[in-house]
Regions:
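Short, solvent-exposed segments of well-ordered alpha helices
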Residues: 9-12, 17, 21, 152, ...
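Short catalytic/ligand-binding loop motif for oxyanion handling, primarily in non-cytosolic enzymes
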Residues: 23, 39, 49, 169, ...
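Active-site scaffold of zinc-dependent metalloenzymes
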Residues: 80-162
Length: 272
């Protein structure tokens, strides 16, 4: 008798506003309307989000942890405790490229790591979407429901979503990723790049991973406007210098939805 395949994961297409205003009672998967190569996992709780994605976070970007193998359950628990965190607080939002996710699952299989049911569900979603094929340019992001933690207010949820969507664009749009890389090298001074690395290292990112540094640079400096998460002094930068960098970034930015977002910030600033 043939084995029945798992039912397809239902995915709804939604705008940023629709995703932000959604109040999940269980995990909901969205395809971002402005860029269908971005998938958004909208979790009802930080615990649910952490169980699915914390091991991926450790593998891809967390400082002090190996990026060439997948942690066991015991190693992951110890790493989270060593940071003074819990499953819920390890990350508030997640973002990963299709290629990084494919590598994670391939290594987990080769190392015979026992994955959680939530991680196996994620594997099925990615298989459904064809993300394990070579050369796929796509991004997976996540966020928790407003009220799932005292820190996750409505404004914090909106800030997390905007930040993570910019990562989704970076992962899914090679032209944008190349633009960010060139901007990092040519528009920020060496001292400014060092200050950004220092800020990100304090946030727990592995500062040795250069692509991670310039990807986070664009997300924080250009698209994170909530002072709870970022202010220019956190990267040893003045407000005036940050405004100059934002204007220069906008001037050369590829056309598209994310450019429109940055332009709207500039328009609002001029109107004040």
């Amino acid at each position: 008798m043939p084995v029945a395949s798992a039912p397809a994961v239902q995915i709804s297409t939604a705008t940023e506003t629709e995703i932000n205003e959604h109040a999940p009672t269980s995990l909901t998967v969205f395809r971002f309307a402005d860029n269908p190569r971005i998938l958004v996992l909208d979790f009802a709780s930080l615990h649910e989000q952490g169980k699915m994605l914390n091991r991926v976070a450790a593998f891809v970007e967390k400082a002090g942890l190996p990026h060439d193998r997948v942690l066991t359950d015991g190693e992951l628990d110890a790493a989270i405790r060593a940071q003074g965190d819990t499953v819920e607080t390890f990350y508030l939002g997640h973002d990963y490229a299709a290629a990084s996710l494919a590598r994670f699952f391939a290594l987990a299989d080769s190392e015979q790591i026992m994955l959680d049911p939530a991680e196996q569900w994620l594997r099925a979603l990615l298989q459904q979407e064809g993300w394990f094929a070579s050369g796929v340019a796509a991004g997976l992001i996540s966020l928790p429901a407003a009220g799932s933690d005292p820190r996750i207010t409505a404004s914090a949820r909106a800030a997390i979503l905007r930040h993570e969507l910019s990562h989704g664009e970076f992962f899914s749009n090679p032209e944008y990723a190349e633009y960010v890389y060139k901007f990092w090298l040519t528009e920020l001074t060496e001292d400014e790049r060092g200050a950004v690395r220092d800020f990100l290292a304090k946030e727990g990112y592995d500062a040795r991973v250069e692509e991670l540094m310039f990807n986070e640079m664009q997300a924080y400096l250009m698209f994170t406007r909530d002072p709870t998460f970022f202010t220019p002094d956190m990267a040893a930068m003045t407000h005036e210098r940050l405004a100059t960098l934002q204007a220069r970034f906008l001037a050369g930015m590829p056309a598209g939805w994310l450019r429109n977002v940055l332009a709207s910030y500039q328009s609002a600033a001029l109107a004040r």
